Every structure is written in C-alpha cells, then in structure tokens.
Amino acid sequence: PPFPSYSFNGENLSSDENIGIYLEDHYYSQTDAAVVFKRVDNRNGDTRFIYHGNDGTSMPWNDTAQLNYLMPEVREAVIKTIIGLAKQFRIIRFDAAMTLAKKHFQRLWFPQPGTGSDIASRSIHGVDKAEFDQIFPVEFWREVVDRIAAEVPDTLLLAEAFWMMEGYFVRTLGMHRVYNSA
C-alpha cells in the first residue's frame, strides 16, 4: 500500500469469488480516508492497490476507482461506454469533468517531476510535460464531444467544471453546457 498505516481487513465487497475488493479499515471507523482500495485475485494471489477518484481538494471518493487515461484503450473504452449511454439517453451529465482535463489529470495523477502532488503518494509517478503530451496528445473531452457529434449527434453533453475551466470547456473542448457546483 502507499502508506504503511493502511490495513485492509474488512469485508470483501466483490460479488465475484475470484476477486477480492477491500476498503481501507479506517473508512469504517471514519478516522481516515485512504487514497486506495485493495484488489486481490484469489486465483493467483495478485494484489493491487487501486486509487480512488480524487480532485485533490479534500477526501478521496471512496465509491470510485481512478482509471489511467494515459492508456488509449482506457480512453476508448470510456468513450464507447459514453456513446452507448448516449444511444439510450439524450442528455448526459459528467460529474467532476474538470479532473479529466489534461492539465488537471497530470497535476493530480502524473505530476511534473519536482512539483509534488495534490494526491498523497502520486509524486513518485511524475511525468514531464513533453512526455505527458506525447502519451495523452488530445484532450479527452474533445475526443468525447467529437465522437458524440459524429455518432449520436442529438445528445446534449453537460459537464461539471470549476477551477476557472468553464469557458475552456465550452470554447475549446466543445462541451454543450457547463455548470459550476462549487
């Protein structure tokens, strides 16, 4: 685990007998909010610690798992999921969308070396800006907006964005509507 004080002795939350999912014990006593949960493959013992989603401003979102959007296959899988939803629902709202804007995704999950991190333990995963831009060349939300326009054009996309990103989301990323819940 990222911190030696973390322990994962609670109930297995997975419905799959092959996989164990465990929240950090302090979640239950409400004395801490861990940045990760534990995933165990019961078939081979492979253990991984998966980060919770987090905007770096307060406690992690313990009901989420952070995806690695540096991986093109992750971005594509999420976009396909959004397109599938758009075929069923003509309005889609993206919660905390600003956390996936490139500058904030890097700040939170792959901070530039020497800058520290807003999420504890992430500074060891630092990536310089040039490398980050090469790995993640196009804004994720621009990809989403363009694909929705091409494949499900009657869909209204609504994004939660703050940190002074509202105009950027509309003018640069093409999001249809933006709201600031802060």
Predicted features along the sequence, with ranges:
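Alpha-amylase-like alpha-glycosidases and glucanotransferases acting on alpha-linked glucans and related
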Residues: P2-A182
